[in-house]
Amino acid sequence: IRAKIFLCFLVPILFLILVGVFSYKKAAAGMYDTFRDSNEQTINMANQYLDVSNSFIEAEALKYAFQSDLGKYMIGLYETDAVQRKTVINSVGSSIRASQAGNDFISNIHIVTEEDVQMLSTKAGGTVMGIYKDYKNEMLGYSDNGKKIPEWVDYHNTLDDTLGLKQSDYIMAYQTTPQSGKGFIVIDVKASAIQQFLDSLDMGDGSIIGFVTQSGREIISEKLPDGQESTRADGETVFYGQDFFNNLEDQQTTKEVSINGKSYLFFYSRMERTNAAVCALVPMEIVNGQADDIRNVTIAVVLIACVVAVLIGIIISTGIQKNMKRISGRLEEVAEGNLTTKVSVKGHDEFNTVSYTHLRAHETLANL
């Protein structure tokens, strides 16, 4: 009887386990999709925000490219007119400083002129003459075909050496030529502004968010738990050069990757304007964290249900066994001829009815 009772309790428990497993899988799948979609939106919005910021930088550069007086100054037409030359220098100098102050993403603005013409820049320093030819030759080296100078570049070493610029101050630069065709307006994108923006994004403890340029320069923001320090070495790339990053053709990608034996969800969104990308690595333990909580609760509920069912089964089966022993024991006494015995059972169930029926039968037999 005890085994049958346990079996009766076991069947609903098995169904409870199946319901728990099904619920966990559905919850895990739903939370995974929700988490993935939410973070894809975060990365895409970050991409769009930075892309819009870059469009403002392009517009700022084009503003100077179409200034007639500046174009004439850059090719040396005002070198014989000291008054006009000074007027242009002061006017453009004030204007580029105002542009720098008005846009948090602008590090510096440089006006690269012909060799015999003074350059203009927001970078403080003395009088520096133009480096147009050397600068152009460097930029042609970055060109895909050796002819067309790229608009967005990650480095301008010639300009850095000439003006004493630090490459850590900018992450990339936009450049365009004036209407005259000689000279460059160069605007550096401030690395610290992008770093601050990436730091404002929150994708969970242990996640890594990065801005990666076309040639592999990176700005990385690590979301470390309290008290934990970064193990990344200075200059070490997180995304560029990795197998999961190389040869990505789609503009947007999300996939699971493994790094040093640890699973991550990789998000990637590339900008059309600059070919730079916003990327993120989110530990899978964060992705599945809430679903794991549901799994743990389900396991706990099932275990408690099993324990309660076993205890109830033991109590019921024990009561049945005791009553069965009392009844069978008294029946054996009657069978041996003892008509004075009485059957007494505990409870108000069917065994009590059996006991009463046995008592009536016993009394009738005794009267006979």
List the predicted regions and their residue ranges:
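Extreme N-terminal signal-anchor transmembrane helix of membrane signaling/transducer proteins, especially
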Residues: 1-29, 33, 37
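Extracellular/periplasmic ligand-binding regions of membrane signal-transduction receptors
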Residues: 40, 55-91, 112-125
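Extracytoplasmic/periplasmic sensor domains and loops in membrane signaling proteins
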Residues: 83-94, 123-161, 224-256
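Solvent-exposed, extracytoplasmic
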Residues: 91-101, 180, 184-227
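Extracytoplasmic/periplasmic ligand-binding sensor regions of membrane-associated signaling proteins
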Residues: 100-108, 113-191, 197-200
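Short, hydrophobic beta-strand elements of compact beta-sandwich sensory domains
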Residues: 176, 181-191, 264-291, 295
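Cytoplasm-proximal transmembrane signaling helix
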Residues: 211, 273, 277-335, 342-343
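Conserved small/polar residues in nucleotide/adenosyl-binding loops
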Residues: 357, 361-364
